[in-house]
Amino acid sequence: MPVIMGTAGHIDHGKTSLIKALTGINCDRLAEEQKRGITIELGFAYLDLTPEVRLGIIDVPGHERFVKNMVSGAAGIDFVLLVIAADEGIMPQTREHLEICSLLGIRAGLVALTKTDMVEEDWLELVHEEVQTYLAGSFLEGAPIVPVSAHTGAGLEELKGYIAELSSTFAPDRRSDLFRLPVDRVFTMKGHGTVVTGTSISGALRLGEEIEIVPSGHRSKVRGLQVHGTAAEVARAGERTAVNLYGLEVAELERGEVLAHPQTLFPSPVWDVEMTCLSSSPNPLKHRTEVHFHHGSREILAKLFFLDRDKLEPGETAVCQVRFPRPLPGVYGDRCIVRSFSPLQTVAGGRIINPLGRKVRRHSKDMETLSTLGAATGEELLLAQLRLAGRGGLTVAELRIMTDMESKLLDKTLQILGGKQLAFQFDRDDKRFVGADVLDGLAGACLEYLGEYHRREPMRQGLSRAELISGFGRGMHPKLVHFLVERLVKSGQVLLEADILRLPGHVVSLASDQSGLRTLMETTYVQAGLMPPTTKAFLEENGLTAKDVAQMFRLLMEEGVLIKVSEEFYYAKTAMDEIIGRVRSFFESNQEMGPQDFRDLTELTRKFAIPVLEYLDKEKITMRIGDKRQIRKR
């Protein structure tokens, strides 16, 4: 994995000339840039420090009008080369670029004092002292300050030495294995088709692989790859990459989108961000402020919502919800920059702590968990994200972007949490997990729901799984309800009998008139045997209405006394068991059974035989083929 160095500094301080002197590569690719002598777009170069180590260099524009491009380039760098012209010293974009680098989480770098051939030695010493003083307290405090001249070559070898030394301190596996490439250019190349370019943030991309453009959702395959202008089989994190895509038109793509492997990024219209307002900001950031929001290669208008305050004062840090006009993809730990409208300047920056946020009320109970996400790592971070997700749970793919964990580490951590009974996989198809604290809360709520149901429906044994899902489980993943029920049944907190769920202490409570009705109905249907009365006949004979008996029919079915064969007929279970027994005995010596065979077997008239045969088919005891029936294997 290459190390990436980015330049920073004021316009016309010699960043591009210095890179050309170091590498021989002119980073100004636009005719306008070469004519005007300023960098507008990002420039890219490389320097082979050793046969094994190639340094990628991103040359960012210094003009204040092109700060959005500077942010795009700085997002993927490991360390910064702050360029300050000896004849001018520290200037406005010097300050803004350093602040942006700090907000983007860059924690290492060095300084080049350029144009030293244009100043006297004593002036150079004064500028050196000024820079040292300015950098005190910043991440560049104590960093090497190297006087150089791109014109004469003075100091270049010394600068290369410091760059090589700093590059050697970065671990090769410092980035995750989730491939992402923010698109900064889209164009058509004659004979090749659509090409996108960008700098890979993490992971790797190979020829022929399928990719997804996020958030648009377009799919394509990698037709060709170039890394630093050379054809390649694979592009890795930190490399300047051009990707030739199959079957996509330029109009279908735009700067700011992200290339990724399919179903690895999940756009959201809300991000939770740990936001810091710059100490140098002239004003606080107010709740509901609309801002220019920069992330990767995208600039978009967004609104900031503070959950525990009305404004964020300069120098303060707080959790903030960033809400976008459309869903965008992010990953835990990604850095972002906020610029004000008027004047247009950098005022804040932040770090994504939840890329799958959801709108919450101010002073929400989620604030306690959100406030811990910035410093959380490993198991603690995983559990916090599962807690925020609540009853919906999270898939492994979602947890990957919510923790930025390398895939093998994530799988191992989930196994450890499962062993500790702190996280549970309730959907093996989607690999979806829920936290133990969420599950415990749901278990308590489910027991309360069942208790309330028993109080409301004293004549019912309980309720079915389907009723529990449509009632208590509304808005929950159905598989989570099943998982929860299994745990409650296994622990003995809930009883499951004939698909009816009830609390252990619940018994059906009947008033005296209901007890009499129960006896009447049970006696009538049991004594009727294989030819019970129709529902209508039973009601008329006993002066009852359908409303009078609805609950009792349901209770007797739950208790296993009656079986509903059709809207017209209920059978005593003992009678139906007798019919099923006769049918099974018949098939011990016969391959098929016709309607007349069944009537002869049961002595039922057509009025009873047809609904009973249809019931046997529905219960998968028999199978109808034409006008015959065959027995189903148990």
From Swiss-Prot:
Organism annotation: Desulfomicrobium baculatum
Sequence similarity: Belongs to the TRAFAC class translation factor GTPase superfamily. Classic translation factor GTPase family. SelB subfamily.
Annotated stretches, region: G1: 9-16
Protein name: Selenocysteine-specific elongation factor
Region annotation (G3) ranges: 59-62
Keyword terms, alphabetized: Cytoplasm, GTP-binding, Nucleotide-binding, Protein biosynthesis
Region (G5): 149-151
Major location (coarse): cytoplasm
NCBIfam families according to UniProt: selB, small_GTP
Entry binding sites for GTP: 9-16, 59-63, 114-117
Region (G4): 114-117
Gene3D superfamilies tied to this protein: 1.10.10.2770, P-loop containing nucleotide triphosphate hydrolases (3.40.50.300), Translation factors (2.40.30.10), Winged helix-like DNA-binding domain superfamily/Winged helix DNA-binding domain (1.10.10.10)
TM regions (residue ranges): none
Domain tr-type G: 1-173
Gene name in the database record: selB
Subcellular location per the Swiss-Prot or TrEMBL entry: Cytoplasm
Function, as annotated: Translation factor necessary for the incorporation of selenocysteine into proteins. It probably replaces EF-Tu for the insertion of selenocysteine directed by the UGA codon. SelB binds GTP and GDP.
Taxonomic placement: Bacteria, Pseudomonadati, Thermodesulfobacteriota, Desulfovibrionia, Desulfovibrionales
Superkingdom of the source species: Bacteria
